[in-house]
A protein has these predicted regions:
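Translation machinery proteins
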Residues: 1-34, 57-58
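Ribosome large-subunit tunnel/peptidyl-transferase-proximal elements
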Residues: 3-5, 31-43, 47-50
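Short flexible coil/turn linkers enriched for glycine and charged/polar residues
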Residues: 20-22, 32, 121-122, 159-161, ...
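Flexible glycine-/small-residue-rich
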Residues: 30, 130-132, 169-171, 179
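Residue-level signature of catalytic and energy-coupling elements of molecular machines
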Residues: 38, 90, 167
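Short acidic, glycine/serine/threonine-rich loops at helix termini
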Residues: 39-41, 83-85, 140, 176-180
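Long, charge-patterned amphipathic alpha-helical coiled-coil/hairpin "stalk" segments used as oligomerization
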Residues: 48-154
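Flexible, glycine/charged-enriched surface loops at secondary-structure junctions
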Residues: 154-166
């Protein structure tokens, strides 16, 4: 697969059937009534008035980007977020998802809590979290198969494109998974 061609790159959000096994941190750029809904949903709310200040303070913007896994934003604030925080959030793949005025942010947040992001960028390797050590082997297997099936669906030759597959814990050794083509 030629990943220099952007159409061959993969960026997928996979819904994990057994969840991520750890809490997900989600923030929302919102004001007024929508910020009250976001707080009620358990989201951290970032006031739209501070977006410009964060854009001027690169270090604070990076800390914020690293603190949260996903971002949501009211549609009117998307342009401001892109202008001031796009250089920080964009390369991390954390640009906010727009939330229409008639949609409850809790619905979107609940969907993101069980989501893993699979990105290839311009390298031929994928790195993604599929769960935590506290989950059982059956749960981790279900999550791994969900990710595997989604990635295989995107590759033109399926398993023929896979040279090797490894599974590892954060600080543990890696184990090779046999890929049968």
């Amino acid at each position: 697969v030629d990943l220099k061609n952007p159409s061959n790159r993969i960026q997928e959000e996979v819904r994990l059937p057994s969840g991520r096994g750890k809490p997900v941190r989600i923030a929302m750029f919102a004001g007024g009534e929508m910020s009250a809904k976001a707080r009620a949903a358990g989201l951290d709310v970032i006031d739209p008035m501070t977006i410009e200040d964060l854009g001027g303070n690169r270090q604070q913007a990076r800390k914020m980007a690293n603190r949260y896994d996903f971002f949501l934003s009211e549609i009117p604030h998307m342009g401001t977020v892109g202008r001031f925080l796009g250089v920080v959030l964009g390369p991390r793949g954390k640009m906010p998802r727009p939330v229409p005025p008639n949609v409850d942010p809790a619905m979107i947040a609940n969907g993101l809590k069980d989501t893993a992001v699979v990105r290839s960028r311009d390298k031929i390797t994928f790195h993604t979290a599929l769960g935590s050590r506290e989950q059982g082997l059956d749960d981790l297997t279900l999550n791994a198969m969900a990710i595997w099936n989604r990635v295989m669906g995107r590759l033109e030759r399926g398993t023929g494109n896979i040279r090797s597959c490894y599974v590892k814990t954060s600080m543990g050794p890696s184990y090779k998974v046999e890929v049968i083509t």
